[in-house]
Amino acid sequence: MPRFDSTEHVRWLGNHMQTVLEYGQHAYIHGGFGYIRSDGSVDDTKPVELDLTARSTYIYAIASLLGIPGSLRRCEHGIQSISNAFKDPNYDGWFSLIEPIQEHQKLTNAPGIPAGTEGNRKSSRAMSYLLEAAAAASLTHVSSAKELLKQAITVEEKYFWNEEVGRVNETFKRDFSEMENYHGMSSNLHAVSAFLSVANATQDKKWIERAARIVSFAMEQARNNNWRVPEHFDGDWNLDRNYNVGTPADPRRPYGINVGHNFGWSRRIVQVAAALQKNGLEPPQDYLQVAREIFDRTAADSWCKDGHSGISFTVDYHGKPLMRQRFTWVLTEALQAVVSLAFALREQGATAEELEPYFELYYRWWDYLEGYVIHADGYWVGELNANNLPDDTVWPGAPDIYHSVSVLLTPRLPNAPSAAAAIAQGNLDHPLSAEHHKALWE
């Protein structure tokens, strides 16, 4: 079986990443980054999302650190858009969704207008992407990123991080006067990634410790639920197994177990453990066992379960597939998890023979993406039906490039520090120590 670091595979990863980055340029609009249609054009009539803008900003910060021309100005555009168009002029924080920028706003840099109910709420998920973008951009030559990161940390600590429970709050009314009576593991998953990025940008270990507290709760939930991490909780953090039972196709809060997020938890556990160890702190003794159990359970629940290749979007609490749509982001989370697990297992002494099942899954999943998802121009199909035909039932149009670029980079980077810091420190294509890297392939 080929290795993660085979010369031709790494060359393919790098070449296609540059193609994807070129494709992602289509998302550039006034006020941030927008939706790309399936034909590659940007839809500038839709409201502009903080999520998408921050994610694209993060990716172009990464590309800037890689030295890819044109990326710095796109990163700077994202930071300026977040700082101006999305910044709430009357209350703390940033709008989650704004109306398309009008001509007079382009000339004056006036704040954006929040779009609908969602736009008037302050979201932990969006804050996590903002933190990740600002943290990565602060390592580039975008000078205003450091100030944005400072402001974002203040808002995160004031409203979203809950020190008492060791997790993040979900959403608030615009003025932060009322918090949603719901807690989700999705927001906490994204918070882990954001906190690790902030820790690397600020050199403040408390963010790693906060990420570890979130991961500890996810591990506890996995142990108590047959190695599945449930998604939905009420305002007092009681598990709500019936949340959205009538809307299994909800794109953000589907009923049941979210397969992509469970693969994500498997990876975040080993990333946090690596960050703790790198900073002289002790990870939980069973972190690797729990990460493997979650990964193995999720793969068994979701991969090739209905006579066709592909990974189901959701399963019920017993592992039966529910939403059988295939979302590309789910498979990218699976691929990143298999890489992170293999690296972590090698650091613990696993042999190449013991890692062979992970190598096999890795290349089978890349073959699936190449066969059904990846186009030569950098477009990745975002959604397929159960027969692996392109679909737009849940997510019309093309996905942004956050997940595609991330999965193309993961095999080339260590589990810690986070991607931007690892690249800035010269760790690209050095994911393991020299000793473990050599031993991995012997």
What are these regions (language model features)?
Residues 1-442:
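Glycan-recognition and catalytic cores of secretory/periplasmic carbohydrate-active enzymes
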